[in-house]
Amino acid sequence: QLFECSDGIRVIGDEMHDVENAVNAIEYLLKMTERGETLNEQTVRYVIGMVGAGSAGLLHSLDGDCVCITSRGKPIKAKTVGQKNYLDSIASNTVTIAVGPAGTGKTFLAVAMAVNALRAKQVNRIILTRPAVEAGERLGFLPGDLQSKIDPYLRPLYDALFEMLGMEGYTRNVEKGAIEIAPLAYMRGRTLDDSFIILDEAQNTTPE
């Protein structure tokens, strides 16, 4: 049980272990707010779950530097231990393969790492690509010209770049060739030196 007091929060429980877990979870959540992070139900549940599983120490690995600053000044950081491991893998390996449910930040964090590498001049350009269709679909059955057909499939990549760079920054980098977004089918025979390459939705690729 939690009780609000004049000097803080009092935690009362039958088991000392449970009380300690509750205190650890509350202290970490307070630390997150002090860093300016926004709390939501998903974040609170994650912290409680990690503490309850005896992994409270791993939460402190998330306190590191941000990956990237968005065009609106928002810092992008790992919010879970899985995301932290993902970012560490990208930073230390030539190729990283990420598998996970939709909405877990795979594309967004990869784009953040790419933008950070471009800003730091570690790479000369960012190439983002994905299969132009979902598994079992054909472009020929979709209305419009080729660009209008493939744009909906590339929208998650556009959204992530707009968040990181803003519309003006995105347009400027595209015009000078520093950012390229294209269907995977257009990548055959390309020279990809000094590039940060992200292949999104790779599970929809075919042997061809």
Task: Locate predicted features.
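Conserved glycine(s) of the Walker
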Residues: 105
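Pre-Walker A adenine-sensing motif
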Residues: 75-91
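Conserved D-loop-proximal element of ABC-family nucleotide-binding domains
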Residues: 206-207
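Interdomain "pre-motor" coupling segment immediately N-terminal to P-loop NTPase/helicase cores
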Residues: 3-63
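Walker A (P-loop) ATP-phosphate-binding motif of ABC ATPase nucleotide-binding domains
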Residues: 95
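Conserved P-loop
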Residues: 108-178
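Hydrophobic anchor at the beta1->P-loop junction of P-loop NTPases
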Residues: 98-100
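Walker B catalytic acidic pair
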Residues: 194, 201
